[in-house]
Amino acid sequence: MASFIKAWGLVIISLCYTFFIAKLVPKGIKRLILFFPVFLIFFIVPFLIYSLHLLGITAFFIAWLANFKLLLFALGRGPLSSNHKPLSLPIFLAVSCLPIKIQLSPKPTKTHSHEGSTEGPLIYTIKAVFVVLIIKAYEYSTKLPEKVVLTLYAIHIYFALEIILAATAAAVRAMSDLELEPQFNKPYLATSLQDFWGRRWNLMVTGILRPTVYEPSLQLFSVLGPNYSQILAAFGTFVVSGIMHELIFFYMGRLRPDWKMMWFFLINGFCTTVEIAIKKTINGRWRFPKAISQVLTLTFVMVTALWLFLPEFNRCNIVEKALDEYAAIGAFAVEVRRKLTAYLF
């Protein structure tokens, strides 16, 4: 915990530096150069943390999201620059280092299938209970088929990530009264790969990859025409996402990458671009029934995840490390309760 506090203290100091630099230096190359030391610090910070959970959160929040947000901010773009008035320092710090984005437009009316998730505390409590049950099931992983264990990993990732992101957004919303954009949008209801990756799964990542990778690539390849530029930009976005996922697992496992996770995103990216091309060709003249599209989409994502993405958790011993941390937390809680009982009675 001490290493985590020191690491995040360094993060806060670095963000304060960028905040005040932006007051003095206009957007552009000069500001970008002055931000460069912060980019390096944010890539190094996860190495200072020993707890698997705190390391994973820091790698995602800081090494990936915060660095990408600051890159955009240096150029006068992104969530740190897109407000009508400059952000105050506390709001700047929150938006920089947390997976949140201020919703600028009024909350849309629920008139279509892509509205943000409106799940309440009860649903998140149920999901938290499922996470606890899954963690308990890991104790019997040696007796379960490998694919069953990997499927439990997938459910664990989805529920845990959704709970962490929703809790973070709820805390910021309660303290600042800001309206924030949703984090997930029922990815299990996706009707296509484009729908799953672009509109439903981990929308914070989608929202930061769009201005940092997709839109610049779209402009770069515009000489090839709108169809080819969109396909190449979409594929490039998956490439960058794959690299960042490999980096996060390198932080957590400290093992040389075998690039299977990269292949997961390359395959999903390639198939998504093929899907986009087919949609443009048929131009809405024919489509699968919605239920069949949902089953095919979820099946494809799960099959490729079971093949390439989820086995990386075993290779990096992430589950074993996580169980050790849960046991340590449980032992600490028992010790605290024992001391409190002895003190009070």
Curated annotation (Swiss-Prot):
EC number: 2.3.1.-
Subcellular location per the Swiss-Prot or TrEMBL entry: Membrane
A GO biological process held by the record: sterol catabolic process
Chief location category: membrane
Membrane topology: Multi-pass membrane protein
InterPro entries in UniProt: Wax_synthase, Wax_synthase_dom, Wax_synthase_Magnoliopsida
Summary of the knockout phenotype: No visible phenotype.
TM regions (residue ranges): 1-21, 32-52, 54-74, 86-106, 120-140, 148-168, 231-251, 258-278, 291-311
Keywords (A to Z) from UniProt: Acyltransferase, Lipid metabolism, Membrane, Steroid metabolism, Transferase, Transmembrane, Transmembrane helix
Leading EC class: transferase
Pfam families membership: MBOAT_2 (PF13813)
Record-level GO cellular component terms: membrane
Molecular function in Gene Ontology: O-acyltransferase activity
Biological function: Involved in the esterification of cycloartenol. Not implicated in the formation of sterol esters in flowers or during seed maturation. Has a substrate preference toward saturated fatty acyl donors (16:0 > 18:0 > 16:1 > 18:1). Does not require triacyglycerols (TAGs) as a fatty acyl donor, and is unable to acylate diacylglycerol to produce TAG.
Assigned protein family: Belongs to the wax synthase family.
The protein, known as: Acyl-CoA--sterol O-acyltransferase 1
Organism: Arabidopsis thaliana (Mouse-ear cress)
Originating gene: ASAT1
